[in-house]
């Protein structure tokens, strides 16, 4: 064989080896980059915000009040709530996190308790700053919680209804043990808090004390919600969401796909009142129709015209209250009403 042919073969083999090494290196770098980005998505969405909600640097707040004072004008109902005295309670969940709950007692003795479940990156008193007065004026007790990794409660990771519904079931046991085994409970959740109470409503262990659920602007599942948000941002869903879910399953210990409110309401144990704004572009309005159609128990639906996400109550308080009162009239014992 001529020498130049052997040389050519060596050159070709070297080129192939170099190509394989380069391709392997590129794939490795892509894998590392994918892992890093997936983890960052997981951490940004699921990990607790480092700042405690409601706390603002005094100088920053003063500057904002000077430049944009209308942002600090409180609704009279919120001002009223700020003047009320709450009883503080706590439980420790199965993860070892101390969770906080706050009771606004009715002016007169009542066996009706509204369990308030707040949304993502919010906290109890903030979410129910307007609605608390409505229920209090009806003569009901209002019990508001801070979910894990929110407000004054401990915890590192947000469960999007998975951990929160588990913890809320523990809160219900605490309530019946503390306030009476025969109390009547109304579940009321907003956004992620809505997903929480929907999952509770389909739990076969839901106590008979729960009389009905108000489900305000909840998503069908976090997987579908994240898919919707990524597509809106023109970001490819796959494999990014799969990667984030991989970290979520191993770190936060739940699967985005298995937090399924549609499945839960299909086994609902109590009547359900679904509420959603027609202009909700965060949790799109179509989701409430899927949830309503899947619900297996007595149900009703209120669509609030022009309301954005979690804005149905301030947008049309009268319609909202009227629909809730219709459920109260139907499902709460007469002697317990205001």
Regions found by a protein language model. Give the residues of each.
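Hydrolase active-site cap/lid region
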Residues: 199-255, 263
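Conserved alpha/beta-hydrolase
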Residues: 135-154
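An N-terminal hydrophobic leader/cap segment in hydrolases
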Residues: 27-92
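Short beta-strand/loop motif that positions the catalytic acidic residue
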Residues: 267-268, 274-276, 280
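Alpha/beta-hydrolase active-site loop
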Residues: 158-179
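The serine-hydrolase catalytic nucleophile loop
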Residues: 120-134, 147
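Catalytic active-site module of serine/aspartate enzymes centered on a nucleophile-bearing elbow/loop
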Residues: 315-338
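Catalytic histidine neighborhood in serine/cysteine hydrolases
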Residues: 293-310
């Amino acid at each position: 064989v001529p020498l130049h042919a052997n040389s050519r073969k060596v050159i070709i083999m070297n080129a192939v080896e170099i190509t394989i090494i380069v391709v392997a290196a590129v794939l490795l770098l892509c894998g590392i980059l994918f892992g890093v980005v997936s983890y960052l998505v997981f951490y940004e969405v699921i990990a607790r915000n480092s700042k405690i909600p409601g706390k603002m640097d005094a100088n920053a707040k003063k500057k904002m009040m000077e430049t944009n004072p209308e942002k600090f004008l409180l609704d009279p109902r919120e001002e009223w709530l700020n003047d009320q005295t709450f009883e503080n309670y706590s439980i420790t969940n199965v993860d070892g996190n101390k969770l906080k709950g706050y009771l606004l007692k009715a002016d007169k003795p009542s066996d009706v308790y509204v369990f308030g479940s707040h949304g993502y990156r919010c906290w109890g008193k903030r979410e129910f700053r307007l609605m608390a007065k409505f229920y209090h004026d009806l003569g009901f007790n209002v019990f508001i919680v801070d979910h894990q990794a929110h407000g004054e409660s401990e915890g590192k990771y947000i469960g999007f209804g998975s951990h929160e519904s588990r913890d809320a079931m523990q809160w219900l046991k605490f309530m019946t043990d503390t306030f009476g085994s025969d109390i009547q409970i109304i579940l009321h959740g907003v956004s992620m808090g809505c997903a929480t109470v929907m999952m509770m409503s389909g739990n076969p262990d839901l106590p008979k004390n729960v009389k009905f659920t108000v489900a305000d602007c909840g998503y069908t599942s976090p997987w579908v919600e994240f898919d919707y948000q990524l597509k809106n941002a023109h970001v490819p869903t796959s494999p990014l969401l799969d990667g984030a879910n991989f970290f979520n399953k191993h770190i936060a210990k739940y699967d985005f796909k298995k937090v399924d409110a549609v499945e839960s309401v299909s086994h609902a144990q109590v009547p359900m009142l679904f509420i959603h704004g027609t202009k909700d572009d965060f949790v799109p309005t179509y989701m409430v129709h899927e949830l309503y159609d899947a619900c297996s128990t007595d149900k009703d639906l209120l669509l609030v015209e022009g309301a954005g996400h979690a804005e149905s109550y301030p947008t049309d308080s009268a319609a909202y209250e009227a629909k809730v009162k219709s459920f109260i009239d139907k499902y709460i014992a007469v002697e317990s009403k205001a």
